[in-house]
């Protein structure tokens, strides 16, 4: 499988990725963000039935680069997106 190239910005939309790609994708994305000096990001997982959100939050709880996360405010996606603070001292 070819590596997926994604631009490193403060927002990532997971709609275009397969669920099985999400854990490795987020790990690589967070690492790239820290290396680029981006410490606050928004992960868009969508609202739907909340299955992907639960998976994302599970991943965030276990990731050493993540220091905090919460639902985005309504103007930034509400419960269809998660705001993530990354560790600046890695």
Regions found by a protein language model. Give the residues of each.
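Long, charged, low-complexity intrinsically disordered regions
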Residues: 1-90
